[in-house]
Amino acid sequence: MAKAAKAAGSSARFRQRKISVKQTLAVLKQSDIPDLEEEQQRELQQIETGVEKGEEEEHHLQAAINSSIAQSTGAKVEKIYIPTPDASQVWKEYDRFYSSSFHEPASYIRTSVTVEETSGCLYNMDDEDAEFLKTCKPPISEDDFEEVMHRFEVTISEKQPFVSIDVSNLLSFEEMAQHIEDGIRQVQEDPTSPEYILAQLQSSLGITVNGTKGKNEGKAFLATFKKIGAVIYPHWRARKVERKGQSIVPHLKFEDHEKDDSDPYVCFRRRELRQVRKTRRTDVLSIERLRRMQAEMETAKQLVEMVATREFTRKAALKAEWDVFEDRCAIKTLKRELGIKGEDEDLVAQKKRKVEPKKEEKAEKASTPVRGGKAAGSAASAQAAAAQAAAAGSGSPSVSSTHVPPNVSIPPSKIPNMDLITIAQVVRDKDEAIAKAVREKLRLRADADRDWHNLTNSGYIPYCEYLNAEVSSSGEPPVPQYSSINEMAYFEKHNASHRYTTKSDFNKDLASMVGNKPFADAQVYGAIVGDDGELRLSDATSTSSPVDRVIPRSSFMSMRKRVGRGGRMWMDRRGLQRNTVLKPSSLAKNSLDDTAESEADEVAMERLADRQKYDRETEPTRQMSSYDKDPSQLNGISSDTQSIRFGSMLLSKAYENYREVFQQRQQQLMMLQQQILQQQQQQQMRNRQQSHPPGDPGAGLGGGQGAGGGAGGSRNNSPAPGTNGPQSKMHNAAPMGYNKQGMTPSQHQQYQQMQQQQQQQQQQQQQRKMGVAPMNAASAAAAMAAQPRRSSGSPDGQRFNGLPNGGAMANGVLPNGMSQRMMPGGDMKQKSELAKVDA
């Protein structure tokens, strides 16, 4: 019944293991199996003993299980207990069998699982060693014997690790003893060694070891080794030879793949892995790999053979050339000795002739299909033709025989040998191509602009530190940094007022239009611009640009949100400053000297400024200097990144031709200035001749003329005697042309002086390194004396309002804006001199 329960329980709980040929199987008959009823079998399967399977057969346990089953069915059975030893009493004979002699150890128990050397001597005696110690004289203790044997084993493993190859070459005792003694002394002198630290602790703490207090173990063992080392060495050598050089200390035996694994002493056997099933597919893949490898090896072999054949052929060719050279030298010497004269062409090394391809190869090359159809073929032919043309133009030898168009499928054996090109050469060729393109672009630009004169109002003149060196000292560029993109890109509202200064602007029909719509390139000096785009002059000597806003240099708007007291949210804007354009002082210059009226204007302007303080979404409007008109500054681009913004201008703004173009422009402007002065003088001379007869004493320079006339005239705004406003306007509309007839000798003399001064200025302009020389005070005074003045409000002033700086040119002197624009060498000192002469 117990066996049946065991079989039933094992079959229910454990998986049947795989049948092996090495496992014995029990053969059971029907009579061996107990015939149990189905109900009893079902009950037995549900009983759990709670012990291991090997202990379920214990008869006390089986008796207890059967009695509990009988009690559950209602039968009366004696209660059975499993006997256990009685632990309630004390064993009286305990002291006789277990002695209580215990000696406290010298130190704590030390052990190391990973480092075995720290656990003490690793050598353990066996029966042979015990027999040797019995017969050994003088007697040796077991601990000393094991320590010496261990030292021998460690020393031989360090000095002769391959002693198993030849056991007869073991070290002698003298060599081993010398090495062991040196090692002991080195350990004793090393403060970091465990033996040294242990000895110091024992001596300092007073710990006794084997009855000796603080004794150094190293020194004790060294003395012991000198006594018994020579006695133990023959025994150790005999055992080493018996082991064939292997270690005397027994080691675990591991599995050896070369031998049979049926050895029962092998430990740590490998886990048996499931053998991989071989199928036809794996065999095919292996065969394919082998075939591919064989083909690659054969190809490599053929390549090596071909390279070797090529090198041998080259060697033979070099040897043949050398033989030919020696024969030529011998023939030359022989001809000199015999005095033979004749042609020596065969004795000179001629250039090798290029081997022409055969007709068959040419036909095959011509019939080779081209990828991509006709378009690819035409592109390939075009590239080939371009490459040939470039080679011919640069003087390099033609490569047409070895050049192959791209996208052409040819066999690998017929790929031409092309020279390798370095990266430096590619970069150099690219730079040369770019420089050549720049030069060609500049040449075409110069040819296209040869018959044109650039007289535009808003021509952009980039700032150059080399050509405008005086900017660093004065702080103001002599040429306004202005570009037409200010109106075109940012100020589309004022495109209608943008005009160009050409000869067509000087006729009578456009005079009214020019007077009503001022130009956009006039220099701004403290002008106020209204929201309607109209100009409000703050100074009688300056005009204003139609610019009514300034593009911010930084971001469009910078805002910050913060939490104030009481949880209120505040929004702060960056750059909330007072509007400097709406200052009352800017309008006080044009107003009368009435104190009450000026104070009222100031109060009104303050109220207006306070009302419009937060109405602007950008930075407060401020005065634009010549640097602010530069596009890079308008766009808010820093000086470090301007090269990115203006990188596209490199082809047309080359520095090597900029200086020449700049000087040509200044010369053209000077010529235009001279022509305008001549036209003004001629027109004024005609006006005086028509208004005063030849005998009239008012024809002199001191006669009364227009407002702001000559040196002897008054500077009022009323017409001079002998002239009137409409008449002078009609005179200004007369045809222009220079004519010496009708001029008085004094006027002609003054005109010649003015021409001489202009010639001197041109000479100074050529001598200057960086631009045109400015006009001095003498030339400005001569220009003032040579022509009368007219007020900016007169018709003549409106007539020449198209010139730079408004109609100040009609006054007979170079206006401030013109002197600064046309003469880069001018500065603020020159402006002050002109102002003094004008006064």
UniProtKB/Swiss-Prot annotation:
UniProt subcellular location: Nucleus
Biased composition (Basic and acidic residues): 608-620, 828-839
Biased composition (Gly residues): 697-713
Compositionally biased tracts (Polar residues): 621-640, 714-730
Swiss-Prot/TrEMBL keywords: Cell cycle, DNA damage, DNA repair, Nucleus, Transcription, Transcription regulation
GO biological process, one term: regulation of transcription by RNA polymerase II
Region (Disordered), start-end ranges: 350-379, 393-415, 608-640, 679-839
Pfam families: EPL1
The keyword GTP-binding belongs to this UniProt entry's keyword annotation: no
GO CC annotation: NuA4 histone acetyltransferase complex; nucleus; piccolo histone acetyltransferase complex
Keyword hit for Lyase: no
Chain intervals with Low complexity compositional bias: 679-690, 747-786
Functional description taken from the UniProt entry: Component of the NuA4 histone acetyltransferase complex which is involved in transcriptional activation of selected genes principally by acetylation of nucleosomal histone H4 and H2A. The NuA4 complex is also involved in DNA repair. Involved in gene silencing by neighboring heterochromatin, blockage of the silencing spreading along the chromosome, and required for cell cycle progression through G2/M.
Subunit-level organization: Component of the NuA4 histone acetyltransferase complex.
Family, per entry: Belongs to the enhancer of polycomb family.
Protein name according to UniProt: Enhancer of polycomb-like protein 1
Native source organism of the sequence: Yarrowia lipolytica (strain CLIB 122 / E 150)
